């Protein structure tokens, strides 16, 4: 049936509307899950702060890991933050060590650690300047409970999720980091962790080209029964990783925009990485930048999907971003009216045309051919 449906011709506009609707569904479901999980964790701090802490790396012995090599290539198209990560990945575990792990042999590596019967292996990394992406295998000797894989996926979303509890650097509270991927069986989960680093690369092209990323995991948890946060299974342990990510600055494209709206909101510039695009927005004095929402549309006027929940990074995966349109809207107006209102005019206007009459400030930017 799915193959037959894929053969039915549909317009690009309808195809894009369906994709945008599914992206919205994913975002709503993730927000609900985050609320449930944060309640269970006793209140969490900002996700982007929790992993940049100094750790001692203690290599551990590993059990047999059935799927560990080339994880980016296997799952980069199935998760919500899609990207060509395999084209830019830094391999942490060489093929020789991967073969040993898959054969059940002992590997002494800082990227493979076991605690309380759960092995965590970090096999690949890529750093875009806007985020760090880690390819991970998580293996439980005793098998994960059914709730981990039965409650964490739907046909609409198409991927599964595990959550990592990590200590927040300043407060000591736990924060939750989401790993998206799939369960290969009841014992093994493979996925990609995305950690936001917005601000590390600036619109003038300056920034951090290399990063030492520290990840300390105190517990691993999955999904529990709907509405029963206290029943979410949780595995405590100690997994500490230090990973270096290197960025080829030639992959970063920046454009100075300096567009100012009537209310004083300013689009300073655009930053485009191999995976995402981000607009630097500045609020006028006395106004809160958090009260506005930035939308970026591709060269065809279609809205780009958000790459993350915690920042306004937009995915460029398989989209034409040689030219983009940027719109800064009032947050409440966009969330309460504009986002839902587009469906009424979608047959007449692109998303860019629709937003042009509502934006506090907007700009059209063309990236020069490389």
Q: Residues of each region from the PLM?
A:
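Internal signal-anchor transmembrane helix that establishes type II topology
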Residues: 30-60
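Alpha-helical, hydrophobic structural elements that either
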Residues: 18, 53-370
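Disordered, charged N-terminal biogenesis/targeting segments of membrane/secreted proteins
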Residues: 1-35
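Long, compositionally biased, charged low-complexity segments
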Residues: 25-38, 334, 347, 351-354
């Amino acid at each position: 049936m799915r193959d037959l449906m894929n053969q039915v011709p549909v317009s690009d506009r309808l195809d894009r509307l369906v994709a945008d609707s599914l992206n919205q569904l994913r975002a709503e479901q993730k927000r609900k899950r985050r609320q449930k999980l944060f309640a269970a964790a006793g209140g969490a701090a900002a996700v982007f702060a929790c992993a940049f802490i100094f750790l001692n790396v203690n290599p551990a012995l590993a059990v047999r890991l059935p799927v560990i090599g080339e994880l980016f290539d296997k799952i980069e198209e199935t998760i919500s933050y899609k990207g060509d990560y395999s084209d830019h990945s830094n391999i942490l575990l060489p093929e020789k060590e991967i073969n040993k792990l898959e054969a059940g042999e002992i590997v002494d590596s800082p990227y493979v650690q076991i605690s309380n019967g759960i092995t965590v292996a970090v096999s690949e990394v890529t750093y875009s300047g806007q985020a760090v992406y880690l390819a991970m295998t998580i293996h439980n000797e005793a098998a994960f409970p059914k709730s981990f894989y039965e409650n964490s996926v739907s046909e609409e979303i198409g991927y599964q999720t595990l959550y990592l509890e990590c200590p927040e650097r300043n407060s000591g509270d736990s924060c939750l980091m989401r790993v998206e991927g799939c369960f290969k069986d009841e014992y093994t989960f493979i996925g990609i962790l995305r950690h936001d680093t917005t601000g590390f690369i600036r619109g003038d092209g300056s920034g951090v080209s290399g990063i030492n990323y520290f990840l300390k995991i105190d517990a691993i948890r999955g999904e529990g029964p709907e509405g029963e946060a206290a029943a979410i299974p949780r595995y405590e342990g100690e997994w500490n990783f230090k990973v270096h990510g290197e960025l080829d600055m030639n992959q970063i494209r920046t454009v100075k925009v300096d567009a100012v709206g009537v209310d004083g909101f300013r689009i300073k510039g655009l930053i485009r990485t191999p995976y995402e695009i981000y607009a630097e927005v500045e609020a006028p004095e006395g106004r809160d930048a958090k009260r506005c929402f930035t939308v970026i549309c591709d060269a065809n006027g279609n809205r780009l999907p958000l790459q993350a929940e915690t920042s306004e990074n937009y995915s460029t995966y398989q989209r034409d971003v040689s030219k983009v349109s940027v719109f800064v809207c009032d947050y409440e107006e966009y969330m309460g009216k504009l986002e839902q209102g587009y469906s009424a005019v979608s047959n007449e206007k692109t998303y860019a045309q629709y937003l042009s009459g509502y934006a506090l400030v907007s700009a059209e930017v063309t990236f020069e051919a490389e």
